[in-house]
A protein has these predicted regions:
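Hydrophobic adenine-recognition pocket in adenosine-nucleotide-binding enzymes
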Residues: 8, 85-87, 120
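Active-site acidic-Proline motif in GNAT/NAT acetyltransferases
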Residues: 88-90, 94, 122-123
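Acetyl-CoA-dependent GNAT
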Residues: 7-14, 18-77, 83, 101, ...
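Conserved active-site alpha-helix within GNAT-family acetyltransferase domains
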Residues: 98, 122-140
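Conserved acetyl-CoA pyrophosphate-binding loop and the N-cap/start of the following alpha-helix
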Residues: 91, 95-103
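Conserved GNAT acetyl-CoA-binding A-motif
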Residues: 101, 109-119
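Extreme N-terminal starter segment of soluble prokaryotic enzymes
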Residues: 2-4
Length: 148
């Protein structure tokens, strides 16, 4: 079965937030609905920040993928970060992750992105295998974070 990909708009905020809360719950990340709503509204009304695609199977919403933009001198220009990629549990391991990554790689080339980055939890072996299958590689670097 083939997925359809719909570019998200502010009208989709509620649907995305429902899935985002499930996504965050997988690894026990805190989820503040009011804060998430403000962040999502800002993102979806600022196309220079990135894009979110809704994953649809027939008429059913089964997931989403958020691609954010940034700039890198090392990599030669605008790059993308696959910030969030969620598929509802009952639809996993059915090829929809592969379909989504295939689609996003095409879109990234259309957007003239130089590189795509992503991060995954160490325990997410299925996700890591999928990303490796699509050519994502571990860099011999550490992603460090400082909250401001």
């Amino acid at each position: 079965m083939s997925l359809e990909f719909e570019l998200a708009s502010p009208a989709h905020t509620g649907q995305i937030l429902e899935m985002q809360e499930k996504f965050y719950a997988i690894d026990h990340y805190p989820f503040d609905a009011a804060k998430a709503n403000l962040i999502m509204q800002h993102f979806l009304t600022s196309p220079d920040l990135g894009k979110i695609w809704l994953l649809r199977l027939k008429d059913e919403l089964i997931g989403y993928l958020a691609l954010t933009f940034c700039y890198s001198f090392e990599f030669g220009g605008r790059i993308g970060f696959l910030d969030e990629f969620f598929i509802e549990k009952i639809f996993r391991q059915q090829g929809f992750g592969s379909q989504t990554l295939s689609y996003v790689l095409i879109e990234a080339k259309k957007l003239e992105l130089k590189v795509l980055h992503l991060e995954t939890e160490r325990h997410n072996l299925a996700g890591k295998a999928l990303y490796h299958k699509f050519g994502f590689k571990d860099h011999d670097r550490h992603l460090l974070t400082k909250f401001l």
